[in-house]
UniProtKB/Swiss-Prot annotation:
Binding, Ca(2+): G74
GO BP of this protein: regulation of release of sequestered calcium ion into cytosol
Official protein name in the record: Trimeric intracellular cation channel type A
Binding site for a 1,2-diacyl-sn-glycero-3-phospho-(1D-myo-inositol-4,5-bisphosphate): K122, R126
Transmembrane segments: 19-37, 52-75, 87-106, 145-162, 183-199, 211-227, 237-255
Source species of the chain: Danio rerio (Zebrafish)
Phylogenetic placement of the source organism: Eukaryota, Metazoa, Chordata, Craniata, Vertebrata
Amino acid sequence: MEVLDVLNLGEIAQYFSKMAMFPVFDVAYYIVSILYLKYEPGAVEVSRRSPVASWLCAMLYCFGSYILADIMLGVCPIDYFHNNSHILLASAVWYLIFFCPLNLFYKCVAFMPVKLVLVALKEVVRTRKIAAGVHHAHHAYHHGWLIMVITGYVKGSGVALMSNFEQLLRGVWKPETNEVLNMSFPTKASLYGAILFTLQEAHVLPVSKSTLICLFTLFMVSSKVFMTARHSHGSPFALIESWVCHVLFGSPLGTEDAHDHHHAAPAAAPAPLSPAKNKEELSEGTRKRKSKKAE
């Protein structure tokens, strides 16, 4: 405790939890979100063919979590759009990423060192949104733990949960990409973070809110930056989830490996044909050499 007092970690966490997100952190959030939109197949073509549809998709990527959370809590779903500064800022980012001459802005923000910084700033915003969602639900439903968890979860990963609707705006329908069925790391982390913040709001978790925000932000930033740098789509929770599902639900261990193996098996089937093919090629080469000698 004396070491903590000397380092003033409590004061640092308090300052960090009250730090304003606008405009620096919010700009980073918008840039990374719309950058991921541009990575989607056909997104660039849609922006040229129908800029309005592309802009709507970008707004869903930036504000989808607020829209979905407001719908759940009975608030007008377009309530957040009264923040003109945020809408203009997100629209400017969308225009620069998709329509900047020579793609200069996109190349700058997609440059890996810059992208890692932006990803780190985005995770700061994600943690703050999860905490705000749980706090908002706590005021409306003091003892509704499940509602707090769901609201925080939606605030942290609402964009991914609305991905199917966003795809419809681009003329794409991929029901197999349902985020609830195949959760990505940010979605899982948002769920676990919402549970932690709910326990803190219920005074079950013996830690201050500012400290929890600081610690969870450090975890999210370090994990997401590491995964982005390595181009990894895995999850740090995979091993724990595998054992928990095996114990509680009887799921087989190593399901993903077996799944990949089964899918890879048909591709490996033609392998035995290669020796015959090599023999045919060798015999053909031999015949050519003999014919040359005969000539």
